[in-house]
Amino acid sequence: MSDIISIKDIDLAKKKVFIRCDFNVPQDDFLNITDDRRIRSAIPTIRYCLDNGCSVILASHLGRPKEISSKYSLEPVAKRLARLLDKEIIMAKDVIGEDAKTKAMNLKAGEILLLENLRFEKGETKNDENLAKELASMVQVYINDAFGVCHRAHSSVEAITKFFDEKHKGAGFLLQKEIDFASNLIKHPARPFIAVVGGSKVSGKLQALTNLLPKVDKLIIGGGMAFTFLKALGYDIGNSLLEEELLEEANKILTKGKNLGVKIYLPVDVVAAPTCSQDAPMKFVPVQEIPNGWMGLDIGPASVRLFKEVISDAQTIWWNGPMGVFEIDKFSKGSIKMSHYISEGHATSVVGGGDTADVVARAGDADEMTFISTGGGASLELIEGKELPGVKALRSKENE
């Protein structure tokens, strides 16, 4: 996507730069960061700015705070980043308050300031222009490297870009990489191209499935969403997850697949249990024999073998959504095995962020995948063919 202004197109020399990062990382009950992939992903852009003699202001959100609370502070991020960069990170006590402004004003070349959680400012999620103006006033250049929030029109993502001309705003390396991968996947995939789609809800993936069908050679559907398709085919699915209002849509997708010559694969057996809990009794059953009152919570061994066979000749695989309730150990086997099989093959493997990235990390396969997206919702919207507000704001007008 060459019409997106790149960080490399900008004269950064000795400038004060604002980098919107995505440091929305998972933490345990003691606020220890349990996965720092998103922080590591931001490092190439930060280093590039430092190498150009910049002073750098970093900003991100963390979680969905209702109010200012130490639970959502970016302090742990500052500590982890300092360790990864082997460099002091100056931490602001607020976002656009006196502390942040003073520290921003006094920031010297080669120094890094991290602002406090952007969502401590109510205006951030409202795309408030006053907040954007305050943030913009601290710097000379704006860089967006937060792919994970590009599908949201927020102050630090969209409104802020209005205060910079094309010579002073652009996409960081991570954002560029994400967009390039997604657009190549959709426009020029090596074939056979297979999509593996899971997760609990059809509703969240409907648009992506519709957009993917004409582009893929085969489609595998697993996870909770598979039961709406099985029900549409006339199977009795017991108490399994069902989106009744989407049965017609599921049928349309199955018919469209048939008309396009795209083979759609659904589970042939499941791990069934009466309740979704670690200590519930469970058994493997064919999809047509789910006991009354029981629910399917993972794909069974026959489905795992079938799906392994389906992806064996793939040249490109796009995977978004787990195959079962992977958060509970006994229902995680299908997702973990899928991760192993996808990572072991020769195909270009692109993993949609969020839960799928968590599965891959848990399976220990992260290094074997070609690309793991840092954004769940954003990567889905790109595959759906939507223009992301944060990306649109960085397009060069000359090419329009």
Swiss-Prot record:
Pfam families recorded: PGK
Involved pathway(s): Carbohydrate degradation; glycolysis; pyruvate from D-glyceraldehyde 3-phosphate: step 2/5
GO molecular function annotations of the record: ADP binding; ATP binding; phosphoglycerate kinase activity
Coiled-coil blocks: none
UniProt binding sites for ATP: K205, G296, E327, G353, G354, D355, T356
CDD domains in alphabetical order: Phosphoglycerate_kinase (cd00318)
Keyword annotations from UniProtKB, A to Z: ATP-binding, Cytoplasm, Glycolysis, Kinase, Nucleotide-binding, Transferase
InterPro entries the UniProt entry points to: Phosphoglycerate_kinase (IPR001576), Phosphoglycerate_kinase_CS (IPR015911), Phosphoglycerate_kinase_N (IPR015824), Phosphoglycerate_kinase_sf (IPR036043)
Enzyme class: transferase
Subcellular localization(s) per the UniProt record: Cytoplasm
PROSITE patterns xrefs: PGLYCERATE_KINASE (PS00111)
Enzyme Commission number(s): 2.7.2.3
Record SUPFAM superfamilies: Phosphoglycerate kinase
Subunit structure: Monomer.
PANTHER family assigned: PHOSPHOGLYCERATE KINASE, PHOSPHOGLYCERATE KINASE 1, CHLOROPLASTIC-RELATED
Name assigned to this protein: Phosphoglycerate kinase
Source species: Campylobacter jejuni (strain RM1221)
